[in-house]
Amino acid sequence: MKKILSIILTLTLSATVFAQPLPKKLEHNEKMAWWRNAKFGMFVHWGPYCLYGGVYNGFNQRRGGAEWIMNRCKIPVREYRAKACTFNPVDFNAEELVLTAKNAGMKYIIFTTKHHDGFAMFKSNASEFNIVDYTPFKRDIVDELAKACRKHHIKLGFYYSQTQDWCNPGGGTIRKEMKEGWANPDSVAIDNFTQENLGGWDCLQRSASLDDYFRKVAIPQIKELLTNYGDVAVMWWDTPHRISKETAAEITAELAKYPQVITNDRLRRPDFPGDYKTPEGRIPHAKDIER
């Protein structure tokens, strides 16, 4: 009997010592299980760009969503910052928003923590251009939303524009011609300027390098989002352009500390495919949704 027990113990220890990690696909399936079952969620797209209502200098923005008004209408950085300084959404109620999602049968919420304008909807030590330090509102909307989501068992994910940032020095800019904005009499000169400046229209945007921006703003803010608000379900990147392979790898290494976080395919293409695809402006086929 002792010999049998000894053999069993030896086999058990051998299995423990030589056990291999789960196959990558199985790990992916395990992480994605809740996402596949959830099927229905809320994407909250909100920031100080809403103050313009799609109108600049009396002209309607000619193309695109309101969140693109700063770029398409070429609003100077100082002017946009001054407008953002008045952002004061005193009627915001995280509890109401989360319950609206829950009562509709939604299982998760994705919130725009920072869109391309560079304004952080959370308290950030990496940039003063945030809702707590820069506005009379003085409240951390992401914190309030995270607490309400935990209370009502709704998963929370963060949209974060990692490359484009039009107000923090060095942030990326995608070139849009003035014809997409408004009838500016200096449109030709502005278009020439953006052609020569990587899409930027304000000298403040080119006062630092993109690497400086990632080092001082984007990567520190990503760390803040991952550490300050409890369990994060999703990181929803946007604009996979100009970011270097090395920078994307650094962000991915940070994400490795949080294996539960699901990511999309917009960090850097094609090297960093993420967990699911994000077709836009069309109804996708099933094969176009997940890698």
Predicted regions mapped to residue ranges:
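Positively charged n-region of N-terminal signal peptides that target proteins for export
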Residues: 1-4, 101
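Sec-dependent N-terminal signal peptides
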Residues: 4-14
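Mature catalytic domains of secreted/periplasmic carbohydrate-active enzymes
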Residues: 20-291
